Amino acid sequence: LSCAAYGIIRNLIVVQGSINYEFFQYLLIGFGVFSIAIAIPFILVQHDLKRLLAYSSVENMGIITLGLGIGTTLSIYGALLHIINHAIAKSALFYMAGVITGEYQTKQIARIRGLVSTMPLVGTMFIISVLAITGTPPFNIFVSKFIIISAMFTSGRTVLGAGILLLFAGVFAGMMYYCLTMSFGSKPKYRASAVTVGK
């Protein structure tokens, strides 16, 4: 994701002095909104834990692209900060997912239940990581999301900002539904592994 964002930034620098710069900005905004919007249905109907995290990355790439497309100093700063914040939060989340899938021997969300009671430490860290990646305050991604949204409103893009907030709410609802279901749902009747990581 960071490499893709770097590629967009390089192109942004190249076209910045051209007469088509405004068109390029609108193109980035369009791709950003599309990326966030298209991630939501896939998140809401997902059955695979790691694919769920992958579609979350699609949403976050949209946020970065959107910040670059707005084109103000504030939004670009927010986009650059979001690249760093996402890398930290998503790395932690994929690590937790690796431990969870190793313990339960499956990536199927429906078969992962009772994380907090089965692996208290891992379950707690998983919840924290999901809260972080969805931009819940006071975690780092909240800051970069807030900066980008603020840039939309201060640059006069009120409707766009309001729409993006609604999309963020959809992503948050989907991610937290799966997170809480896996963390506090009834324990499965069988366990395929006896790994005790996080107990």
Mark where each language-model region is:
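Hydrophobic transmembrane alpha-helices and their helix-loop junctions in integral membrane proteins
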Residues: 1-186, 194
